[in-house]
A protein has these predicted regions:
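Short alpha-helical donor nucleotide-sugar binding micro-motif in glycosyltransferases
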Residues: 259-260, 267-272
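Short hydrophobic beta-strand element within catalytic cores of glycosyltransferases
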Residues: 296-300, 309
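Nucleotide-activated donor-binding/catalytic signature segment of Leloir-type glycosyltransferases, i.e.
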Residues: 232, 239-260
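Conserved donor-binding/catalytic core segment of Leloir-type glycosyltransferases
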Residues: 7, 189-208, 214-217
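Acidic donor-binding loop of glycosyltransferase active sites
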Residues: 195, 253, 270-282, 295
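A short, well-ordered alpha-helix in the C-terminal region of glycosyltransferases
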Residues: 226, 339-353
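Conserved acidic donor-binding segment of nucleotide-sugar-dependent glycosyltransferases
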Residues: 310-312, 316-323, 332-338
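Short His-centered aromatic/hydrophobic patch
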Residues: 93-99
Length: 367
């Protein structure tokens, strides 16, 4: 008998908070006893994707296909064959879209399964097949109290079966340091106060608050005329946001940097005087990354960011669509006098609660 099977939509072919979180979970899993026999099925990843876990004992099945339908058929067949041959102790379903298939097979074979959930994919009432798959699961893992509460209320889930497995930050990759002279020159920020957001600019999810922060700039500029707003990320919403900067007359202050590789993110965080993302998040790994680099943060006040910000202990929480409140929080941060602006304190508070050792301990407890 093998210990576990995992199913995910994709991990390596897309960048984003969910993908980053799953990689952290797998990395922690690899440090646990008997993990080497596990199998991972990836619906949308191809064999040539950059996989840092290759040759570490886990077997990966890449099922990306030019036809989405054929890819799902291949997943269904290969997953069933693996269940019949190896009879795992437990299946971990990494996305609600895969939960109905997981339920169908696991209930028939009397194999317990766990569903991993993250954010807005489970905040609203789900189709019956997905709702029933959650209700029938042996357990559900999610990343925040906020997602747990919304999911349970919307889908009649017993909260007792839901465990919190929070996001964590890579303290070695995201650390304190000096501002990069290369980036200062690249973005022309030598004498500027810098606000930063890292987010996908997707028109289907305008809740990252980039437009709200842009609307806050005229007020901030009255006190800090040299302020710059650096937006890292790519997506189809960029033209709308660029048009908004011109409409408000702040296009000279906003820098759309596009995609930045993960290995270069820490230097970009350290360039900032404040990380600003007044959004609706299931959690928000980017807040942890910024704070681990010693950068103060602003989040929304109606979402899962309450956890990385420790209910306001280590950051500013504002109404996520209120540009004036965002401006006010920025004006409180930029002088750098508040306790929540002290880099060493901010990093220590963050790592104590959201370091990788915490994730491993929690994962071992749950498994």
């Amino acid at each position: 008998m093998m210990p576990h099977i995992f199913l995910f939509l994709e991990i390596f072919s897309q960048e984003g908070g969910i993908q980053s979180y799953i990689k952290d979970v797998l990395q922690a899993y690899l440090t646990l006893p008997d993990c080497e026999a596990a199998e991972v099925f990836l619906l949308r990843d191809a064999p040539d994707c950059p996989n840092p876990f290759k040759n570490q004992g886990i077997t990966f099945h890449y099922l990306k296909n030019n036809s989405a339908t054929l890819g799902r058929i291949q997943l269904a067949l290969k997953f069933l064959v693996s269940l019949l041959r190896k009879r795992p102790q437990r299946v971990f379903c990494g996305h609600i879209n895969l939960a109905p298939l997981t339920r169908l097979y696991c209930q028939a074979l009397d194999i317990p399964y766990t569903v991993l959930t993250y954010g807005n994919e489970v905040w609203e009432p789900l189709p019956n097949s997905q709702k029933q798959a959650l209700q029938a699961a042996a357990s559900i893992w999610t990343i925040s109290r906020y997602t747990r509460d919304l999911m349970c209320e919307a889908n009649a889930i017993d909260a007792k079966k839901v465990a919190i497995l929070p996001c964590v930050v890579d303290e070695e990759k995201f650390n304190l340091g000096e501002k990069s002279l290369t980036l200062i020159k690249k973005y022309d920020t030598e004498n500027a106060k810098v606000l930063l957001t890292v987010a996908r600019l997707w028109s289907g999810d305008i809740h990252k608050g980039v437009d709200v922060t842009i609307r806050a700039l005229p007020t901030i500029l009255e006190t800090y005329p040299e302020v710059k707003y650096l937006v890292i990320g790519r997506g189809d919403d960029r033209p709308r946001l660029e048009a908004l900067t011109k409409q408000l007359g702040v296009d000279k202050q906003v820098i759309f940097a596009g995609f930045v590789p993960t290995e270069e993110l820490a230097d970009h965080y350290r360039l900032a005087d404040a990380y600003v993302m007044p959004s609706r998040e299931g959690f928000g790994i980017v807040y942890l990354e910024a704070m681990a680099c010693g950068i103060p943060v602003i989040s929304g006040d109606e979402d899962g960011s309450a956890e990385p910000l420790q209910d306001g202990l280590v950051g500013w929480r504002v109404p996520y669509r209120d540009a004036e409140k965002v401006a006010q929080a920025c004006l409180e941060i930029l002088p750098g006098q508040d306790q929540r602006c002290h880099p060493q304190w901010l990093r220590q508070q963050t790592l104590t609660k959201f370091g990788k050792k915490t994730l491993r301990a929690k994962l071992e407890q749950l498994i």
